[in-house]
Amino acid sequence: MKLSIDISELIQLGKKMLPEGVDFFLDESPIDFDPIDIELSTGKEVSIEDLDPGSGLISYHGRQVLLYIRDHSGRYDAAIVDGEKGKRFHIAWCRTLDEMRHKNRFERYHATNRIDGLFEIDDGSGRSQDVDLRVCMNCLERLNYKGSIDKQRKREIFKSFSLNEFFSDYSTCFRHMPKGIYDKTNSGYVENWKEISKEIREKANYVCNDCGVNLSTAKNLCHVHHKNGIKYDNHHENLLVLCKDCHRKQPLHEGIFVTQAEMAIIQRLRSQQGLLKAESWNEIYDLTDPSVHGDINMMQHKGFQPPVPGLDLQNSEHEIIATVEAAWPGLKIAVNLTPAEVEGWRIYTVGELVKEIQTGAFTPAKL
């Protein structure tokens, strides 16, 4: 006997809870998390041998992580009252961690990819509590995060630092997203938001209002942005069609995570449509992935000319070997999300160019 079951309400509920641009299907497989993802969401003790090699961001089994010291003996009570009184957490291989590495003190560190800014600390005597710790300022400088090479700017970034925004800025660098981003629901939208969004995007022909990319072949990467930040204000003058990359770059939109595959699609379409042309530094930042902005900003700070975004690098037989995020053809250097080797070029991954300039290893005379 066949049963007729009306599940339309369930489908509508699923559509409301999913991120913008994503459809809901009952036959989709649920998101499975490895045990390591569960451990990292609460904090896992690690040693230096456990961490993936690299000179910029800290990575553990393909996952972007933070390092912090759980043991707050001697300052536990002070840290609970004021997180700034606690020990700093680390987002990059800064000089502080280099010193710890030399002292072989990494057994004291825990790794986590929790994005709410809370860290579980203890007093060594059985008491533990989640605390809002502060980011290491050496780490900010190490990545030149949002221009932290400037001391005044670094202090401003330190005070306003958001882990959610940080993970969003570097989401393209890792194979796995933090578990915390899947625990959120899209609250605040009206019940028929999906229909409104589809109508607005169709009227705009799925063209991003900022960068101009046509996403008719990748509609899931086409979003609708509320200019005033109020999700239930759906007057047409308050709605703006943006690609997912431009959407995450809007103020207070750090909750949008772009994967490396998604960014590659957006950049490929921009390139095919002749949109990767920039006449100013601001346009360079608009057209490149936020994860390499620290490296690009370092070159700007040192007085170099703006790079070429999305440049195809060819071998001697004119075959395209790699498409890099940003390049300085005259210097034969480039920055990219992933490692690449092209004869005659020096290609840096995220944070490597910053470090080479900071340590004095990079000079135009050597090129």
From Swiss-Prot:
Functional summary from the UniProt entry: Component of antiviral defense system Zorya type II, composed of ZorA, ZorB and ZorE. Expression of Zorya type II in E.coli (strain MG1655) confers resistance to phages SECphi7 and T7. While most T7 infected Zorya-containing cells undergo abortive infection, a minority produce viable phage progeny. These eventually accumulate to a high multiplicity of infection, leading to culture collapse by 170 minutes after initial infection. ZorA and ZorB probably assemble in the cell inner membrane and exert their effect there. This may be a nuclease.
UniProt keywords, alphabetically: Antiviral defense
Biological source species: Escherichia coli (strain ATCC 8739 / DSM 1576 / NBRC 3972 / NCIMB 8545 / WDCM 00012 / Crooks)
NCBIfam families: anti-phage_ZorE
Biological process, per Gene Ontology: defense response to virus
Protein name: Zorya protein ZorE
Transmembrane segments: none
InterPro entries for the chain: HNH_nuc, ZorE-like_t2
